[in-house]
């Protein structure tokens, strides 16, 4: 089995509930989405990066893994594009190294997500709002439905799970409200089922105002009081 990787590096987690933790990032190449705020365009194509055998990639990860690393973060690109190779790689890490396995994904394919889930410790389930332009308007509901299924799968398998929504200048309050009701009312997700709910403001282009971020916060708070507005720390610090 071969896997295409854009980069492997150690830094601090710059997003989400584990912000500030020492992390080994494994960025897989290829992504089917085209979000306007994407900050890793060099990893969008399946021809980006370098191809490795799974065992070869594992050895590089092993040599790159520093002491006291909190987790190995599989990111992209979109890791689910290479789910078969990722499964083998994650299995080797679990058996031979033992750090927490974290998946950072758009959750565009719930079947691939479910395939990987037994090997995951931490799942970030990201919901793309329509203004992200991740997919065309006609297919956006499919993307959301898959992410909702992934959320349910992760919770049912008792994984550490949190939700992230990226907010831009054109993000819709009504759309977020519908999404929140689907999560907490229609799906009956309990607040204790998830580790956190992160609102992440877009950085660099189409940035939302503070007032907009607070309005989004207010939509979520009645359902989930531990909602947090957290920008990308690594962008603020100027690190990878």
Give residue ranges: language-model regions:
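Structured loop/turn residues at beta-strand edges in well-structured enzyme cores
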Residues: 3, 33, 67, 118, ...
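Ser/Thr-centric signal marking residues that sit
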Residues: 40, 75, 105
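Canonical Radical SAM [4Fe-4S] cluster-binding loop centered on the CxxxCxxC motif
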Residues: 3-56
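Short, basic/glycine-rich phosphate-binding loops at helix/coil junctions
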Residues: 36-41, 68-69, 128-131
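Conserved AdoMet/S-adenosylmethionine-binding subsite of the radical SAM
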Residues: 81-227, 232-240
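Generic structural signal for well-ordered alpha-helical scaffold segments
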Residues: 13, 58-63, 152, 181-185
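Glycine/small-residue-rich loop that forms an oxyanion/phosphate-binding "nest" at active or ligand-binding sites
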Residues: 47-76, 80-84
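Short, conserved beta-strand segments within well-ordered enzyme catalytic domains
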Residues: 25-27, 71-73, 102
């Amino acid at each position: 089995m071969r896997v295409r990787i854009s980069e492997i590096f150690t830094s601090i987690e710059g997003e989400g509930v584990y912000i500030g933790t020492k992390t080994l990032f494994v960025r897989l190449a290829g992504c089917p989405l085209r979000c306007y705020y994407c900050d890793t365009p060099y990893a969008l194509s399946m021809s980006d990066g370098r191809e490795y055998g799974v065992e070869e990639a594992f050895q590089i990860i092993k040599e790159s893994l520093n002491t006291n690393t909190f987790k190995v973060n599989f990111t992209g690109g979109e890791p689910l594009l290479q789910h078969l190779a990722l499964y083998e790689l994650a299995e080797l890490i679990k058996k031979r190294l033992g750090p927490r396995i974290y998946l950072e994904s758009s959750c565009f394919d719930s079947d691939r997500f479910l395939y990987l889930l037994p090997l995951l410790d931490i799942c970030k389930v990201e919901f793309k709002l329509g203004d992200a332009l991740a997919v065309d308007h006609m297919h956006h509901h499919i993307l959301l439905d898959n992410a909702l299924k992934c959320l349910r799968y992760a919770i049912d398998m008792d994984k550490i799970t949190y939700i992230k929504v990226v907010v831009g200048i054109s993000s819709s309050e009504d759309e977020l409200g519908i999404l929140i009701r689907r999560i907490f009312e229609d799906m009956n997700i309990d607040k204790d089922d998830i580790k956190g709910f992160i609102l992440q403001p877009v950085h660099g282009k189409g940035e939302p105002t503070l007032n907009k971020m607070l309005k989004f916060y207010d939509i979520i708070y009645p359902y989930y009081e531990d909602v947090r507005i957290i920008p990308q720390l690594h962008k603020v610090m100027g690190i990878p």
